[in-house]
A protein has these predicted regions:
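A shared catalytic/ligand-binding motif for oxyanion handling
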Residues: 1-181
Length: 181
């Protein structure tokens, strides 16, 4: 981590996630970042959602979660899927109860692909953010990058400028705006 950009304040390591509490060096904005690797076993979904909800309870501030959740929200996020499953409902409940936003995906419809026999594709990798995280970072986008070796497409989460409020008064700006320069 570049200490010129972020200061690490705290860390929580869970069974399916690792979370870091960060402070922006330039703007003092404190937020949580969580990397997720969801379970492959349907019986462990409750454990994941409880683990992540405990992170949220400990750090009730701006939050960004990124990773392989190993589940989808809607049937259209998996090729050939037509019905909702209990895992989907649990994921949707987690997103709603924590007031998270699933950022739109640019560049592809799916993030995971298997081409052995019948092709299988789904959007199990994603970035979820809290509203105050999204408001702080301008022009947030989530984009699929080129897949090289893995069966997962890498994601690029990009944020533009940081919201800093009103800019400081500068005499030169006033003089220029009045046409003296």
């Amino acid at each position: 981590m570049d200490k010129r950009v972020f200061e690490k304040l705290d860390v929580i390591a869970g069974q399916f996630s690792i979370s870091v509490l960060l402070r922006g060096v330039v703007d003092d904005f404190v937020w949580a970042c969580t990397g997720v690797y969801g379970p492959n076993d349907d019986g462990q979904w409750t454990t994941l959602w409880e683990e992540l909800s405990q992170v949220r309870a400990r750090w009730p501030m701006a939050w960004c979660l990124v990773g392989d959740f190993n589940t989808i929200r809607y049937p259209n996020e998996r090729l050939g899927c037509d019905l909702f499953s209990p895992a989907m409902f649990a994921f949707l409940d987690f997103i709603e109860s924590n007031s998270l936003v699933d950022l739109p995906l640019e560049g592809a419809s799916f993030t995971w692909f298997r081409d052995s026999g019948l092709p299988s594709m789904s959007r199990i990798d994603k970035a979820l953010v809290s509203l105050n995280w999204e408001e702080h970072f301008e022009n947030v986008s989530q984009r699929v990058l080129h897949r090289v070796i893995s069966d997962h497409y890498p994601l690029l989460l990009e944020a533009g400028a940081v919201q800093r409020g009103r800019s400081a008064f500068k005499f030169e700006n006033v003089v220029e705006s009045l046409g003296f320069c």
